[in-house]
Regions:
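Charged, low-complexity interaction regions
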Residues: 17-31, 46-54
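Alpha-helical oligomerization interfaces
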Residues: 30-44
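Charged low-complexity stretches with an acidic bias
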Residues: 52-74
Length: 74
C-alpha cells in the first residue's frame, strides 16, 4: 500500500499537469488551491512530525514554485 506522501505527490503532480494544459489563469489558481487542500488533508491524516516536515519541504521547494511558474506563464 502506498504511503500518504506518495499519494499526495501523485495528486499534486496531476494538478500540476492539469494546470499546465489549462492555459487559463483562473483554472491554474483552482488547481493550486486543490493541491494546497490536498497538502492540508495529508497533514491532518498523519501523526508523524518527520513526515509532516517532508510534506512541508516538498510543498515549499517543489510544488508551490511549480504552480507559481505556471501562473507566470499563463
Amino acid at each position: 500500500m502506498e504511503n500518504v506522501i506518495d499519494i499526495l505527490g501523485k495528486t499534486i503532480n496531476r494538478k500540476l499537469h492539469l494546470a499546465k494544459v489549462s492555459h487559463d489563469y483562473s483554472m491554474v489558481q483552482t488547481f493550486f488551491h486543490q493541491a494546497f487542500g490536498a497538502v492540508e488533508l495529508a497533514m491532518a491524516m498523519i501523526n508523524d512530525w518527520e513526515k509532516e516536515a517532508v510534506i512541508i519541504d516538498k510543498w515549499e521547494r517543489e510544488w508551490e514554485p511549480a504552480f507559481e511558474k505556471i501562473m507566470m506563464e499563463v
